[in-house]
């Protein structure tokens, strides 16, 4: 961590096809080993699949809705107090909320059984818009953990 000043967040340029910044961030999450062209192909392929399944509905809107549904509101952090560890529920910052939701959607899509990653991602995004799927399960699990440890919320950071 720098001592002198706060390091500014880098500005991410919107994606070339839809002009959406969130989509561009998600592209960077999907990308592995600097292969952005492959990540681009996967995401645009998934959005095409969504458009095919729901004609007339904007695929970018469906993507944004899926991301917003998966965003966690609270999470637990370990805090050591008097020789024992407590799982303390804390509110998630907006930037981390977005990052976690994108990461969880990617991981849930990877675990699916469909043939191509584009198809897996499309199905995971569709399920997330409907409030189900692997990423939603992960979010609910995190929320349950926070709810179960609500008694320790007075150990705030």
UniProtKB/Swiss-Prot annotation:
GO BP annotations listed: translation
Kindly state which keywords UniProt assigns to this record, in alphabetical order.
Ribonucleoprotein, Ribosomal protein, RNA-binding, rRNA-binding, tRNA-binding
What's an example GO cellular component term for this entry? small ribosomal subunit
Keyword match tRNA-binding: yes
What PROSITE patterns does this protein's entry cite? RIBOSOMAL_S7
Pfam families in the cross-refs: Ribosomal_S7 (PF00177)
Show the GO MF annotations: rRNA binding; structural constituent of ribosome; tRNA binding
Show the Gene3D superfamilies listed in the entry: Ribosomal protein S7 domain
Q: What does this protein do?
A: One of the primary rRNA binding proteins, it binds directly to 16S rRNA where it nucleates assembly of the head domain of the 30S subunit. Is located at the subunit interface close to the decoding center, probably blocks exit of the E-site tRNA.
Q: Which PANTHER family match?
A: RIBOSOMAL PROTEIN S7
Q: Which family does it belong to?
A: Belongs to the universal ribosomal protein uS7 family.
By its UniProt entry, which NCBIfam families does this protein fall under? rpsG_bact
State whether it acts alone or in a complex, and with which partners, per the record. Answer: Part of the 30S ribosomal subunit. Contacts proteins S9 and S11.
* Name recorded for this polypeptide: Small ribosomal subunit protein uS7
Species: Albidiferax ferrireducens (strain ATCC BAA-621 / DSM 15236 / T118) (Rhodoferax ferrireducens)
The beginning of the lineage is:
Bacteria, Pseudomonadati, Pseudomonadota, Betaproteobacteria, Burkholderiales
Question: Coding gene?
Answer: rpsG
């Amino acid at each position: 961590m720098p001592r002198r000043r706060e390091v500014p967040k880098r500005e991410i340029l919107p994606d070339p096809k839809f002009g959406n910044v969130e989509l561009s961030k998600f592209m960077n999450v999907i990308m592995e080993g600097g292969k952005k062209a492959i990540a681009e192909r996967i995401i645009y392929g998934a959005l095409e699949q969504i458009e095919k399944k729901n004609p007339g509905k904007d695929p970018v809107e469906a993507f944004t809705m899926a991301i917003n549904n998966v965003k966690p509101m609270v999470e637990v952090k370990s805090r050591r107090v008097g020789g024992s560890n407590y799982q303390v529920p804390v509110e998630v910052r907006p930037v981390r909320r977005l990052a976690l939701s994108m990461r969880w959607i990617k991981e849930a899509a990877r675990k699916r059984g469909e043939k191509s990653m584009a198809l897996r991602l499309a199905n995971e995004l569709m399920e997330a818009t409907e409030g189900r799927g692997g990423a939603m399960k992960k979010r609910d699990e995190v929320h349950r953990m926070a709810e179960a440890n609500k008694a320790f919320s007075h150990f705030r950071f």
